[in-house]
């Protein structure tokens, strides 16, 4: 069985060497969809009986590990030194330094890597993360899917 929980957050970024307007500082209303697989819990009387995982628990993990960390932050590539220096000069600015350019593809992959370790098989029902879908806009998104990600 597969279940999916959607969360939204706002963040700024730029794609430093992009040929178009994405090279400028800008922001998005991102949406993050987390898809998990597992067996439906059959334990009689368990709070999660009939579920793969309680949707509120799926949400809490994604909020703690990704959405709250990235929300109202500027996601900046470590190699984008001009912008990084500028952001570091602003006292108290919420900046998240990324090891890769913060494209939708790289953000989806980063979210997958972080969340994969967080959704552990706590119920004994073979729970695991299958996909992270990150919407940059309502019409543009990237998927990080378990069977397409190398174990690096």
Task: Indicate where each model-derived feature is located.
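Charge-rich, low-complexity N-terminal segments
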Residues: 1-152
């Amino acid at each position: 069985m597969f279940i999916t929980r959607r969360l939204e957050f706002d963040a700024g970024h730029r794609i430093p060497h992009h040929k178009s307007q994405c090279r400028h500082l800008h922001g998005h209303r991102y949406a993050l969809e987390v898809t998990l697989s597992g067996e439906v819990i059959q334990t009689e009387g368990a709070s999660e009986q009939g579920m793969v995982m309680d949707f509120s628990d799926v949400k809490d993990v994604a909020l703690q590990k990704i959405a709250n960390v990235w929300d109202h932050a500027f996601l900046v590539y470590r190699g984008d030194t001009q912008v990084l220096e500028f952001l570091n000069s602003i006292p108290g600015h919420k900046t998240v330094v990324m090891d890769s350019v913060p494209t939708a593809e790289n953000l989806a992959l980063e979210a997958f890597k972080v969340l994969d370790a967080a959704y552990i098989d706590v119920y004994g029902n073979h729970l695991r993360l299958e996909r992270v879908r990150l919407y940059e806009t309502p019409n543009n998104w990237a998927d990080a899917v378990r069977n397409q990600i190398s174990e690096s």
